[in-house]
Design a protein with these regions (language model features):
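Non-ligating segments of multi-cofactor redox enzymes
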Residues: 1-136
Length: 136
């Protein structure tokens, strides 16, 4: 019996940008908290992760909208993750079979099988895949 595909929905109208979902994703997938335990701050934003990469699989992006004099503004939150494409280009180009589709219909990279060729990075139309330097 094939399980019914499931999704992860983030209601950005109630998101406060606490990034607890980022932390939970890292914990669930056993990813390091940050490379060398340093946070990369952008200098002009509260968004400390800034992008998806090999150690950040979920990103809550802060979209900051301010008036010209910065006296009035608002934050909008946008959640970004792997799209788990039905026809996943990353899966199709992987020469070692390290990228698989699970029984839950999710696309997963098996780091123990990956040879680090980075073909998947070039193939991803959303720019989601990155290299986890801790794995190599």
């Amino acid at each position: 019996m094939i399980s019914e595909p499931m999704g992860f929905y983030t209601d950005t109208t109630v998101c406060i940008g606490c990034k607890a979902c980022e932390v939970a994703c890292k914990e669930w997938n056993q990813l390091p908290t940050s490379v060398d335990n340093l946070l990369e701050m952008s200098g002009d934003s509260y968004d400390n992760t800034r992008r998806l990469d090999g150690t950040h699989w979920r990103h809550v992006k802060f979209i900051e909208q301010f008036s010209e004099d910065r006296s009035d503004g608002r934050w909008l939150m946008m959640s970004d993750v792997c799209k788990h494409c039905v026809r996943a280009p990353c899966l199709e180009v992987c020469p070692t079979g390290a990228i698989i589709r699970t029984e839950f219909d999710t696309v997963v990279i098996q780091s123990d099988t990956c040879n680090g060729c980075r073909a998947c990075i070039a193939a991803c139309p959303f720019g989601v895949i990155g290299v986890n330097l801790c794995s190599f």
